[in-house]
UniProtKB/Swiss-Prot annotation:
Entry-linked Gene3D superfamilies: Divalent-metal-dependent TIM barrel enzymes
Pfam families: AP_endonuc_2
Residue positions binding Zn(2+) 3: 181, 226, 228
TM ranges: none
DNA damage listed as a keyword: yes
Protein name: Probable endonuclease 4
PROSITE patterns: AP_NUCLEASE_F2_2 (PS00730), AP_NUCLEASE_F2_3 (PS00731), AP_NUCLEASE_F2_4 (PS51432)
Family (UniProt): Belongs to the AP endonuclease 2 family.
Catalytic reaction annotation: Endonucleolytic cleavage to 5'-phosphooligonucleotide end-products
InterPro entries: AP_endonuc_2, AP_endonuc_F2_Zn_BS, Xyl_isomerase-like_sf, Xyl_isomerase-like_TIM-brl
Keywords: DNA damage, DNA repair, Endonuclease, Hydrolase, Metal-binding, Nuclease, Zinc
Necessary cofactors: Zn(2+)
Gene Ontology terms for molecular function: deoxyribonuclease IV (phage-T4-induced) activity; DNA binding; DNA-(apurinic or apyrimidinic site) endonuclease activity; phosphoric diester hydrolase activity; zinc ion binding
Length: 300
């Protein structure tokens, strides 16, 4: 199974540190932001420590590598033209960075219409993607299924399909399926994942599904909240999420966790991923998992 998590990329180690962290978690794939997800400040490509990282990635047989674009980039904005222009320019450079890092997929929250309406937002996203995509690019932009919080677009499979259909170079587009977002959007991941997957296949096509964000949800189906929970400790539950990980139609799709750190406060919290990966590989829910993570400071 292709199973991993978000890992950090920072300091002097950069991508090498990301690969080391993924290996320590017991992962065989991983996702990174090219800088802080809350801003768009980025280091030059030559400072990302790529050659040293590539050697470790090959030695540990890690991959595919997934890049996540920052949250604050909004291609759906028709209200502020300067924000839309900035989003295009940033994402053009993000594609170049992702390719240099060896990433095959760039996860992108499609955008929010900020009050102009979903149709206007979708048209603007299509316009932006048509400016960003290059015929020769190797990394795909993987539009993420959204929870429908606020004015987000992409909460329904039909909206994602509309974006893809409107883009000229849509062979450069794929989809990230987030289990928390999709449940929060109203799809029954907990009890009928096969049915949801069949609907996705009918509307978008399974050949477009290139990344899965494997997250439990703190809120019930249809809540439109987007609050991730640790695997098995939310409203979707362990059995359903383990079923996603082991699904025969999704063997070659990387499953990436973005579950919350565990601890009493922000100064004393620990990455859950080594434990969650081990639990999913074992196939048995551990109700004491969060206590163990905190007691052992995230180390197995």
């Amino acid at each position: 199974m292709l199973l991993g998590s978000h890992v950090s990329m920072k300091g002097k180690e950069m991508l090498l540190g990301s690969a080391q962290q993924a290996a320590e978690f017991g992962a065989n794939t991983f996702m990174i932001y090219t800088g802080a997800p809350q801003n768009t400040r980025r280091k030059p490509i030559e400072e990302l420590n790529i050659p040293a990282a590539q050697a470790l990635i090959a030695a540990k047989n890690l991959g595919p590598i997934v890049v996540h674009a920052p949250y604050i980039v909004n291609l759906g904005n028709t209200v502020k033209p300067e924000n839309f222009k900035f989003a295009i320019e940033f994402l053009q450079q993000e594609v170049i960075r992702a390719e240099a890092l060896g990433a095959s997929q760039i996860v992108l929250h499609p955008g929010a219409h900020v009050g102009a309406g979903a149709d206007a937002g979708i048209k603007q996203i299509i316009k932006g993607l048509n400016e960003i995509l290059r015929p020769d690019q190797t990394a795909q932009i993987a539009l993420e299924t959204m929870a429908g919080k606020g004015t987000e677009v992409g909460r329904r499979f039909e909206e994602i399909a509309q974006m893809i259909d409107g883009v000229t170079l849509n062979d450069k587009l794929s989809v990230t399926f987030d289990t928390c977002h999709t449940s929060d959007a109203g799809y029954n991941i907990r009890e009928d994942f096969d049915g949801v997957l069949n609907e996705f296949d009918h509307i978008i096509g399974l050949d477009r599904l290139k990344v899965i964000h494997l997250n439990d949800s703190k809120n019930p189906q249809g809540a439109h909240k987007d609050r991730h929970a640790n695997i098995g400790f939310g409203e979707i539950g362990f059995d359903a999420l383990h079923g996603v990980v082991t699904h025969p139609q999704l063997v070659d799709v990387p499953k990436i966790m973005e579950t919350p750190y565990v601890g009493k406060d922000k100064k004393h919290n620990f990455a859950p991923y080594a434990y969650e990966i081990a639990m999913l590989k074992k196939g048995e829910f551990d109700p004491d998992l969060l206590t163990k993570i905190e007691q052992n400071e995230g180390r197995l």
